[in-house]
C-alpha cells in the first residue's frame, strides 16, 4: 500500500439517488441541482506488512576466489501482500574485507570463514521484514574418526552410579533427570553423539565443533570469556559447562532458560550464524557424503537413514552421558547401599570446613540453596547481585540460571558474562560485594531488603575454595569415551 490505510467507497442504490434528485415544488421553477453524494465511507483496511516467503539457503564459495551475488535475489524472498514496491537494505556481519554495493555482495575470503547477510525489505509505510543467509568459504572437512570395535559404555545400566544418582529422594536427582522417555541414553546412540559432538563438519566452515566451545579439559566449558562462532562475531555470553546437564529441570537450558530441552539447545547452536551456522538440510547432506556415518546411525537407530531429528537425538544422548560422579567429594560423601559415608573422615579438615560453610542450610545465605549436591546443578534462576543495574536481563530482571559446580575449578571464567577469572573472585563477590537492587534474589536479601554477604574470615574463604576443588572429577574428564575421536 502507498498509505497506511485504504478507504473502500460505498455504492448508493439507484432509488436513493433518484429520491435525492427529486423536484422540490410545482410551477415553472427549475428543479434544484442534485445534491452531491456523501463522501465515500467504508471499512479501513490496514497496511499489510512485508513477509518472508521461503526457507534459508546458504552460498558456498572457494577460499581465495572472487565472488559476487545479488543478495536480494539469493535471500529468502520478501513479499508484500499489497503489492507495494519495497526498498531494500543489505547488511553484513563478520568476514571483514567483503563489500556491499546496493544489493550486490562481493569480495574474496582469504581464509576459511563465513559472513551473515541480512536483507531488509521496507514498504512505503515503513513496515519491514528481514531475511538472512550465510556466505561461507569452508575449509576441507576432517577425516574419519578412530572408534573402538565395541562401543564404550554410556547407558546408566553399565555405570557404577552412586545411590544418590539412582534413587535418592533426599537429593531428588532422579526427579530432576530430564532424559526424555523416547530418547534415553544408549551405548550406540551416545557413541554416534560423541562423533557428532567433535566433528567440525557441524559448522558451515568445517572449522568448529560443539567441542570447540565445550572443551573436555575445561569441564566441557570454555576458557574464553566469549567464544566466536562461524561468522567470527563474539557471542554475548560465556559458554556454560555441560557436565550433569541432564539434571537441569525442563525449561532451564542456557543461562536465560530460553529452551526446553537439550535437542532445542543443540538445534539453536547448529543453525545460528553466530554459532555453528549450518542449516539442518545442509548438515544432513554433509553427513551423507561420508562413508562412516551411515553405519553409526544404523547402530544407534536401527537403519542407516541420516536425518536432522536423529542428529539432534544423538547429540542429546551424548550430553546426557556427561555425568560426573567420581570426584573426591563423591568418594568421601556418596551414599552406598543406603548408608551415607562420613564426609568428615574422608576430607581434609580444611575441605570439611568448606563443606560445612557450603551446605549450612540453617543460614539464610547458603551456597547449597542454589547449587545442590551431589549433582551440582539447580533448577532455579536468580539475580545474584553482580550488578546494581544491568543491560543483559537474562530470564528477566537480571536473572540467570546458576551454573553447575561440578569441575568448577576448571571452568573459569565465571558468571554469565565471564567477568570473574578465578574462584577467589567469585567467593569475594559473595563475601562482600553483592550489589543492592530491587531485583536482587530474596535469598541474598535480609528482612529489610539489604544485601546479605558472607563476611568470611580469610581461613574460611580458603576452606570454601578447597571444598569446591573436591568437586573436580578427574576420572570423568580423562575417560577415553569422552575424548575427541578425530
Question: What are these model-derived regions, one by one?
Answer:
Residues 3, 24-25, 32-45, 138-486:
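Periplasmic c-type cytochrome electron-transfer domains
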Residues 104-114:
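Extracellular/luminal low-complexity segments enriched in Ser/Thr/Pro
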Residues 63, 111-112, 204:
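Surface-exposed loops/turns
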Residues 1-12:
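Bacterial N-terminal signal peptides that target proteins for export
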Residues 19-22:
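C-terminal motif of bacterial Sec signal peptides marking the signal peptidase cleavage site
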Residues 52, 83-106:
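Low-complexity "stalk/linker" and mucin-like segments enriched in Ser/Thr/Pro/Ala/Gly
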Residues 31-79, 117, 126-140:
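Extracellular interdomain linkers/hinges and stalk-like, low-complexity segments
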Amino acid at each position: 500500500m502507498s498509505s497506511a490505510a485504504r478507504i473502500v467507497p460505498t455504492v448508493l442504490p439507484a432509488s436513493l439517488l433518484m429520491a435525492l434528485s427529486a423536484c422540490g415544488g410545482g410551477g415553472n421553477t427549475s428543479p434544484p441541482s442534485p445534491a452531491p453524494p456523501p463522501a465515500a465511507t467504508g471499512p479501513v483496511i490496514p497496511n499489510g506488512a512485508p513477509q518472508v516467503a521461503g526457507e534459508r539457503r546458504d552460498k558456498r564459495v572457494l577460499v581465495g576466489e572472487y565472488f559476487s551475488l545479488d543478495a536480494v535475489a539469493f535471500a529468502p524472498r520478501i513479499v508484500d501482500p499489497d503489492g507495494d514496491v519495497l526498498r531494500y537494505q543489505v547488511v553484513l556481519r563478520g568476514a571483514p574485507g567483503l563489500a556491499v554495493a546496493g544489493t550486490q555482495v562481493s569480495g574474496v575470503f582469504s581464509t576459511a570463514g563465513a559472513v551473515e547477510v541480512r536483507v531488509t525489505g521496507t514498504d512505503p509505510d515503513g513496515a519491514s521484514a528481514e531475511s538472512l543467509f550465510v556466505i561461507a568459504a569452508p575449509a576441507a572437512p576432517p577425516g574419519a574418526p578412530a572408534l573402538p570395535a565395541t562401543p564404550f559404555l554410556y547407558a546408566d545400566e553399565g555405570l557404577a552410579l552412586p545411590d544418590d544418582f539412582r534413587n535418592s529422594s533426599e537429593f531428588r536427582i532422579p526427579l530432576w533427570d530430564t532424559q526424555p522417555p523416547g530418547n534415553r541414553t544408549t551405548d550406540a546412540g551416545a557413541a554416534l553423539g560423541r562423533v557428532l559432538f567433535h566433528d567440525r563438519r557441524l559448522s558451515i566452515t568445517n572449522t568448529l565443533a560443539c567441542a570447540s566451545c565445550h572443551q573436555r579439559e575445561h569441564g566441557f566449558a570454555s576458557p574464553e570469556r566469549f567464544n566466536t562462532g562461524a561468522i567470527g562475531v563474539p557471542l554475548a555470553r560465556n559458554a556454560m559447562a555441560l557436565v550433569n546437564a541432564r539434571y537441569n529441570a525442563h525449561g532451564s537450558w542456557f543461562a536465560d532458560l530460553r529452551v526446553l530441552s537439550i535437542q532445542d539447545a543443540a538445534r539453536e547452536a547448529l543453525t545460528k550464524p553466530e554459532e555453528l551456522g549450518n542449516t539442518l538440510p545442509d548438515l544432513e547432506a554433509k553427513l551423507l557424503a561420508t562413508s562412516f556415518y551411515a553405519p553409526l546411525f544404523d547402530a544407534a537407530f536401527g537403519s542407516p537413514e541420516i536425518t536432522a531429528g536423529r542428529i539432534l537425538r544423538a547429540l542429546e544422548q551424548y550430553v546426557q552421558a556427561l555425568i560426573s560422579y567420581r570426584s573426591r567429594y563423591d568418594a568421601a560423601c556418596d551414599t552406598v547401599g543406603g548408608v551415607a559415608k562420613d564426609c568428615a573422615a574422608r576430607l581434609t579438615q580444611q575441605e570439611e570446613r568448606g563443606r560445612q560453610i557450603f551446605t549450612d542450610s540453617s543460614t539464610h545465605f547458603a551456597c547449597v540453596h542454589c547449587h545442590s549436591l551431589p549433582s551440582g546443578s539447580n533448577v532455579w534462576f536468580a539475580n545474584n547481585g553482580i550488578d546494581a543495574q544491568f543491560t543483559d536481563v537474562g530470564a528477566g530482571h537480571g536473572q540467570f540460571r546458576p551454573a553447575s559446580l561440578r569441575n568448577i575449578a576448571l571452568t573459569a571464567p565465571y558468571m554469565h558474562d565471564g567477568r570473574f577469572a578465578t574462584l577467589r573472585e567469585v567467593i569475594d563477590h559473595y563475601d562482600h560485594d553483592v550489589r543492592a537492587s530491587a531485583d536482587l534474589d530474596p535469598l541474598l536479601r535480609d528482612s529489610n531488603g539489604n544485601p546479605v554477604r558472607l563476611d568470611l574470615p580469610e581461613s574460611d574463604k580458603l576452606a570454601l575454595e578447597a571444598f569446591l576443588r573436591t568437586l573436580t572429577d578427574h576420572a570423568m574428564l580423562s575417560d577415553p569415551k569422552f575424548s575427541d575421536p578425530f
